Amino acid sequence: MVHFTPEEKCIISKQWGQVNIDETGGEALGRLLVVYPWTQRFFDNFGNLSSSSAIMGNPKVKAHGKKVLTSFGDAIKNMDNLKGAFAKLSELHCDKLHVDPENFKLLGNVLLIVLATHFGKEFTPEVQAAWQKLVSGVAIALAHKYH
């Protein structure tokens, strides 16, 4: 279980209020699909994923990216109980979708890159450490059903 300090919670909550969910979610998922092309197999109903520009401009990628990033909002509201907050999503990804749990870590790392790009100098090492702890905690929570 991941434990957050009050300072880490404050850092994440403050910065989360500045995140454009639509833009950041679509970019993070799009980058995941481009950088790790084997993840595309989970999105075969998304249409054209044949190139980087096709992926980044794909409305289904953007919509699902928004949905994924919205779930990070739930994580921020439930930082003290990530496992409980993601129990149903863990079950869905394990039992129905059969997603390799390593992909959750990959998405978290891609999200950190996107946040760093968007926030620039505001994304200090302290901020990165707090976000890294959150995305790692979410990945662990999503992988919980696999154990």
Swiss-Prot record:
GO cellular component, one term: haptoglobin-hemoglobin complex
Pfam families: Globin
One biological process term in Gene Ontology: hydrogen peroxide catabolic process
Signal sequence region: none
GO molecular function: haptoglobin binding; heme binding; hemoglobin alpha binding; metal ion binding; organic acid binding; oxygen binding; oxygen carrier activity; peroxidase activity
Reported tissue expression: Red blood cells.
Protein name: Hemoglobin subunit epsilon
Organism of derivation: Oryctolagus cuniculus (Rabbit)
